[in-house]
Regions:
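Internal helix-loop-helix
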Residues: 1-60, 101-108
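Structural signature of FAD isoalloxazine-binding scaffolds in flavoprotein oxidoreductases
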Residues: 6-16, 76-80, 156, 162
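Short glycine/proline-enriched turns and hinge-like loops at secondary-structure junctions
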Residues: 7-8, 76-78, 89, 102-107, ...
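A glycine-rich, basic-preceded beta-loop-alpha segment at the flavin cofactor/substrate interface
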Residues: 11, 131-141, 151-167
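A short, Trp-centered hydrophobic/proline-enriched beta-strand micro-motif
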Residues: 60-68, 112
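A structural signal for short hydrophobic beta-strand segments in well-ordered beta-sheet cores
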Residues: 82-85
Length: 167
């Protein structure tokens, strides 16, 4: 329906395992693209978002990233510092995510943000950000010990204006 193979996780995992046996970095990149970016849009996005982004991601024309991890909180979404503040019909996103696969090479990123007080319940929202949005940049590539073929860097958000339709 959205351009994918139609395979489920029972078929996907053995394929990913085979790819990873040859080159673990490629397996990591495939998993970040498919499981983290694409799957979140598929499972939690609305139909308009699925039709807009999934065919491009499934074809490989667009590479996806997932942004949750932060410098001081790791993957604790309740303590994240990246914020999204409503401004009319848009949201303004500020903060940074680190250790993000495809932060440099990715064309879009599903990014988790805090929309309320730190630690409060129901205070996080995901947004799809596209490369080229003003204020949306990536940091330098991390010099890792292993998995070097899977690039990792920081995502930086400096007053990024995002339409509500990307939420």
């Amino acid at each position: 329906e959205y351009g994918g193979s139609g395979l489920g996780y029972q078929e996907y995992v053995p394929i990913l395992n085979e790819v990873s046996q040859v080159e673990p970095s490629h397996g990591l990149s495939v998993a970040a693209h498919n499981s983290l970016c694409m799957n979140h849009i598929y499972e939690f996005g609305n139909e308009e978002q699925r039709r807009k982004w999934l065919p491009q991601l499934a074809s490989g024309k667009v590479i996806g990233a997932w942004g949750l991890t932060e410098h001081n909180t790791g993957s604790d979404s309740g303590g994240m510092s990246t914020t999204a503040v409503k401004d009319g019909d848009d949201w303004i996103i500020n903060g940074a995510k680190n250790f993000i696969t495809h932060a440099i090479s990715g064309d879009i990123a599903v990014v988790m943000t805090r929309t309320g007080e730190k630690g409060a319940k129901n205070n996080s929202t995901a947004f799809v950000l596209e490369k080229g949005m003003a204020g949306f940049t990536s940091g330098k590539k991390e010099n890792k010990l292993g998995m070097r073929a899977s690039e990792t860097a920081e995502l930086i958000f400096d007053n990024v204006r995002v339409p509500d339709s990307h939420r």
